[in-house]
């Protein structure tokens, strides 16, 4: 039986990066879905995007909790009973008394009023409440879709993994908070970075599932595929690096750009022994690494956008430029609350754009990946969209 011919390539106008509907796509895997599952796709996609939006909001609230030094105001982890905030004056005094026992109060906030305590308490409570709400917002629709047969086996497995990651994130959040309740006045930068990075991973994983509901994506097999994947991984790595900057309060120092206090490569990058600890415990090194990785991502995104000539690559480049600008602005202004939150939210937007770019690349037919991204020795023909 003769092989099925590949789809015809569209005309030049349709292949223009900013015109037309773009290149031919790999057919949607409708053969793996029944009629009920096909009909449910818009609702499943909307649900996943809604959960991703909630996670975005939670990351912003988490950033505000950190920047207002509110994260240690609730000294217990009660997944069920802790859902209710203090409702009476006696309950508030009881919560305040627990806070006054920890080092942060005794060494930093000695003499804090009950009103000031309520301010930081509400930030932390809101952050935890959002976590519980997101758990319900994910689980209840998931249970409904599963019970009605609206998800195939692959989606059931993926959603189960996502739900498990959400539970792990809650436990990791408490593990982070617990590090600041004894013998120190802040949380471990290692645990903070892990908590932030896992939030980004869950956010990205949900978007990745939502992006690919209807289409078979190829496995990465070319230079273009690998570069798009590398960009997405670099963004996740940058989020982790940003977590160390936040955990070490590294953004509060060296508030100059493009130099760091007059030096391109500042002295003191390896002040701690052994050298590798500087990556995670030296505020100067953490900020330098965060800057350097930002430059790498910017150059890589610009090169990819030039070679690819696609909408997705252009959007990625623009989000990277915006995020880099926000980062510089935040640094120069010594991390005001609103700018710090914009920069933290911008990181997730860059991740969303990087994953969309990767998704679009893996939806192109292999025969279209013959551009500069695939091999510098070939002709400069480019893949589109």
Positions of predicted regions on the chain:
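Short, low-complexity intrinsically disordered segments enriched in small and basic residues
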Residues: 1-25
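Polytopic transmembrane helical bundles with strong interfacial aromatic enrichment
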Residues: 27-385
